[in-house]
Amino acid sequence: NFTVRGRVIDAYGEPLIGATIREKGGANGTVTDVEGNFFLSVPDSAVLQISFVGYESQEVSVKGRSMLEICLKENILLLDHVIVTALGLEKKESSLAYAVQKVRGEELNRVKEVNMITALAGKAAGVQVSKNSSGMGGSAKVSIRGVRSVAGDNQPLYVIDGVPMLNSTSEQAYSAIGGTANAGNRDGGDGISNLNPEDVESISILKGAPAAALYGSQAANGVILITTKKGNTVGRRDIHFSTGLTFEKAFSLPEMQNSYGVSDVTDSWGEKENLTVYDNLGDFFRTGLTSITSVSVNSGNDKLQTYFSYANTTGRGILNENKLSKHNINLRETAVLFNSRLKLDGNVNVMKQTVKNKPVSGGFYMNPLVGLYRFPRGEGLSYYKENYERYDEDRKLNTQNWHTFTEDFEQNPYWIQNRIQSKDARIRLLLSLSANLKVTDWLTLQARGNLDYSADKLRQKFYASTATALCGMNGRYIEMDYQETQMYGDVMAMVKKQLN
């Protein structure tokens, strides 16, 4: 063997980045670099097969040459985009009767997001994506072609590699655990946020009624198809490492008046005064920070492909004590047997996540914004920040310290942050296996099975003197455990035959 060096270009002399070069009849192969260059060790009698998406493949005999320049011609027929459609089947975009948009995985990962689906914002026409106001670990709201229901669910159906995903949002009302409707809701997160965005190859968004026909009423709001990565077939091992930091700040704060002082209970404001201006709102929020680090190993050949990835996510929200830690492990094996007639594909995806002190959305009792907005203008909050509790001689314990005793309406926001503590833990397991058998040149059979299991635990502590309407005089301790399991399977026969 000797090393042959080459360069792959197009008709205009521009380098083709990522073109595949393989030794004919063997597993030896490589891809071109950013300059279109490649190096490959082959026998002097080897024949190289060069291919690139949208171009005609070419075979070149080495014949002992150490330097090659290969020019590929465009193939207009191959330039038609291939789209993953319903049930994970691939078709040319021009053959579809409904609207489809495709977003590549590289576009999703330009900005690191804890919830991968929020990275879709601004990348697909007609798709509206917004983060929930519940801080780290919260769910995302996605609507395709506008909101269809005012009170109902507008979320699309998520399908991973052809299998529908369990994407329930575990929003918990405090009224369900003995409180009242004024306590607000806790967002327990959604299923799609459990995925590692680095594992995503592409996302296809299906719009219109025909796109959702195969999935029934659960896809009434559209379908988001996620195709995950596999091992490569060029006989090399690629290791990819990435890390990113994201900073967050409160986007918009209300403008507060600074001309009128404190009123009595019956008036909205008091006398006009020359007030000292304090930035109590700005001081309450901090700069959020999210760190996402991932590593993946991609290897394989014509017969066996392997993809492995690990990702670690840590973050702190814009509210103090709101923290997140998440670990993702993914292993995918693909085997091609019996002269490419049988293809087996297996995937194991495990996620472990812990979120501390999720803030609530809405309500009075557990919402720190109520106390912040109603705090007297012209007074600073620093005293109540440092002294959010005081010792009660009668009860012989520390109780909440606040400028008013109307705890049925508002509480010290720093007491809420430090003395209402919660911990949400989730473990999620996704198992999938598929077999594809080419029976004849025109008949292919496919069988798939999937298991989606999640286990959630909530631990929450309300210290004594927290709003008695919710917690009583002595506080409250809550434990909640719940599990969800979804099993899915299908068998398909695909016929591809020319009818005269």
Regions found by a protein language model. Give the residues of each.
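Surface-exposed loop/interface segments of Gram-negative outer-membrane beta-barrel transport/assembly proteins
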Residues: S94, G152-Q155, I160, L166, ...
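Short, Lys/Arg-rich amphipathic segments at extreme N-termini
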Residues: I9-D10, Y414, L437
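Alpha-helical support elements that line or immediately flank enzyme active sites
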Residues: N182, L431-L437, L451-Y453
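Long hydrophobic segments that form regular secondary structure
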Residues: V297, N436-D441
